[in-house]
Amino acid sequence: MIGIYGGTFDPVHYGHLRAALEVREDLELRELRFLPCHQPPHRPPPVADPQTRLRMLEIALADADGGFALDTRELDRGGPSYMVDTLSSIRKETGDEPLCLIVGLDAFLALPAWHRWRRLFSLAHIVVLQRPDYDIEYAEDLKHCVEERQVTDPTQLAAQPDGMIYFLEVTQLAIASTSIRRMLREGRSAKYLLPDAVLELIHRESLYAK
């Protein structure tokens, strides 16, 4: 079973890394792939350029074990990064191996705004990183999907290639890339929020400076 963890990673930080580790361990994934996005269709463009964001990810994962990998196909493809196209490409390579698209709760609640969002369920399971004790309000279309597809036992994800929704509580570190960029613009320290080697690269190349 393979996990797909997409994002701009602008910059990558310990919130991303800790969540990825817990997902990989809890779901017993063979591999978890970090998938840096070239251009998110529904958000402003990233601040750092694609190759710099990729370098930061490479540095952050340099000491990781074999369970993490980088998938650069969205950067290589260029243009808006539609997840349905990305998963279609991955599915052609992986055959019937179960795929898990890993998303945060906010992204999941916005799923009906994604390009061809219903098609995602024929390509992968969706694993939602849930906040403890959080009341969820769904759009009607998404509510029906959850009612039809939610499973509560993660072993069910391994039983078929795609189509299920699983909510996973992970350690929620109150770290956001937006906040880190703001701190750096204001000249404040971002130490202990992201790997030191990533922070060194940011300072060396004056990323996110005024």
UniProtKB/Swiss-Prot annotation:
Pathway as given in its UniProt record: Cofactor biosynthesis; NAD(+) biosynthesis; deamido-NAD(+) from nicotinate D-ribonucleotide: step 1/1
Record carries keyword NAD: yes
Gene3D superfamilies: HUPs
Entry EC no(s): 2.7.7.18
CDD domains: NMNAT
UniProt keyword list: ATP-binding, NAD, Nucleotide-binding, Nucleotidyltransferase, Pyridine nucleotide biosynthesis, Transferase
GO biological process: NAD biosynthetic process
GO molecular function per UniProt: ATP binding; nicotinate-nucleotide adenylyltransferase activity
InterPro entries the UniProt entry points to: Cyt_trans-like, NadD/NMNAT, Rossmann-like_a/b/a_fold
Reaction catalysed by this enzyme: nicotinate beta-D-ribonucleotide + ATP + H(+) = deamido-NAD(+) + diphosphate
Superkingdom field: Bacteria
Family label: Belongs to the NadD family.
Function: Catalyzes the reversible adenylation of nicotinate mononucleotide (NaMN) to nicotinic acid adenine dinucleotide (NaAD).
Protein name per its UniProtKB record: Probable nicotinate-nucleotide adenylyltransferase
